[in-house]
Amino acid sequence: MSTLRLLISDSYDPWFNLAVEECIFRQMPATQRVLFLWRNADTVVIGRAQNPWKECNTRRMEEDNVRLARRSSGGGAVFHDLGNTCFTFMAGKPEYDKTISTSIVLNALNALGVSAEASGRNDLVVKTAEGDRKVSGSAYRETKDRGFHHGTLLLNADLSRLANYLNPDKKKLAAKGITSVRSRVTNLTELLPGIPHEQVCEAITEAFFAHYGERVEAEIISPDKTPDLPNFAETFARQSSWEWNFGQAPAFSHLLDERFSWGGVELHFDVEKGHITRAQVFTDSLNPAPLEALAGRLQGCLYRADMLQQECEALLVDFPDQEKELRELSTWIAGAVR
């Protein structure tokens, strides 16, 4: 029986693909070597310890229907579209070695006619007239008996969109998470015009087979039916949940301030695990009572636009004469925390 396993996803759903990856990683025998090939439609993927409100322009993402996906490995935030080819290599210990998987990807690129080299801890770069340009970034995860290396190859990504979603608004965040480092990047199509995703996958597959001296049939993972993987439904539910993608953010503080016709407002939030643990309101409004009441209502509230808006509007019952002010406040808060 072959020690290799090759899986190719037909899904462009980042939560689906990351759930497949997680299930395979948890249940694979320690003697198996796995290659999983996949790609995502418009998504910002953040590292396990990152704060999405700090790393991403979450409001712009919502407007453009760009998903947020938190992965189980560390590292920084990246934008995925269908111009990215994603790969995951898995192996048991002590065999797991990220230099092996890196060399497999480099061999695949070489077979396609691209000379690339490893740079730093997790990048692959090509030399151009303008200097080194990144074409691949990776992240890693290890447990006591296994490890994986996953990454992306920039094939024909819309690089102009990176700044749309990875340059956050200038929010006053005092975050305890990790800030991403932006790199100078280029697409492989600059070197190999017109090369399709399927050809890149084939090159990686052949390099994988060549390294291990074995071949195996590909397993196609389809979104049309639930994959036959242990605990897939539960893993997908977690991967796609707000609690995982947003709620796992490191603790942070957020200061919002705005001036309205009826007075200035400052809101100070401390947020842990996606919940407001402390809310303070400061205002020079002539009628501060509804704002003082709001501070109490927001304690323990999910740090989510719709929930904050709901708490604002609930105050209309107790403060009907301040309806105009409360509705203005509600609209502003909902926009500011996205």
From Swiss-Prot:
- Pathway, per Swiss-Prot/TrEMBL? Protein modification; protein lipoylation via exogenous pathway; protein N(6)-(lipoyl)lysine from lipoate: step 1/2; Protein modification; protein lipoylation via exogenous pathway; protein N(6)-(lipoyl)lysine from lipoate: step 2/2
The UniProt keywords, alphabetically, are: ATP-binding, Cytoplasm, Ligase, Nucleotide-binding
Report the locations given in the UniProt record. Answer: Cytoplasm
Q: Write the Enzyme Commission number(s) for this entry.
A: 6.3.1.20
Query: Which InterPro entries does the record cross-reference, listed alphabetically?
Result: aa-tRNA-synth_II/BPL/LPL, BPL_LPL_catalytic, Lipoate_ligase_A, Lipoate_protein_ligase_C, LipoylTrfase_LipoateP_Ligase
Q: Which GO terms describe its cellular component?
A: cytosol
Record: residues binding (R)-lipoate: 134
Q: Where does ATP bind?
A: 71, 76-79, 134
Major site of localization recorded for this protein: cytoplasm
* Residue span(s) of domain BPL/LPL catalytic: 29-216
Query: Which SUPFAM superfamilies does this UniProt record tie to the protein?
Result: Class II aaRS and biotin synthetases (SSF55681), SufE/NifU (SSF82649)
Which Gene Ontology terms describe the biological processes this protein takes part in?
Answer: protein modification process
Which residue stretches, if any, does this entry annotate as coiled coil? none
List the Pfam families hit by this protein, alphabetically: Lip_prot_lig_C, LplA-B_cat
Superkingdom in the source lineage:
Bacteria
Q: Name one GO molecular function term.
A: lipoate-protein ligase activity
Which reactions does this protein catalyse? Answer: L-lysyl-[lipoyl-carrier protein] + (R)-lipoate + ATP = N(6)-[(R)-lipoyl]-L-lysyl-[lipoyl-carrier protein] + AMP + diphosphate + H(+)
User: Which NCBIfam families does the UniProt entry name for this protein?
Assistant: lipoyltrans
For this chain, the family text in UniProt reads: Belongs to the LplA family.
Q: Describe the task this protein carries out.
A: Catalyzes both the ATP-dependent activation of exogenously supplied lipoate to lipoyl-AMP and the transfer of the activated lipoyl onto the lipoyl domains of lipoate-dependent enzymes.
| Other notes | In the transfer reaction, the free carboxyl group of lipoic acid is attached via an amide linkage to the epsilon-amino group of a specific lysine residue of lipoyl domains of lipoate-dependent enzymes.
| Binding partners and assembly | Monomer.
Designated name of the protein: Lipoate-protein ligase A
- State the organism of origin: Escherichia coli O157:H7
Q: What is the lineage of its organism?
A: Bacteria, Pseudomonadati, Pseudomonadota, Gammaproteobacteria, Enterobacterales
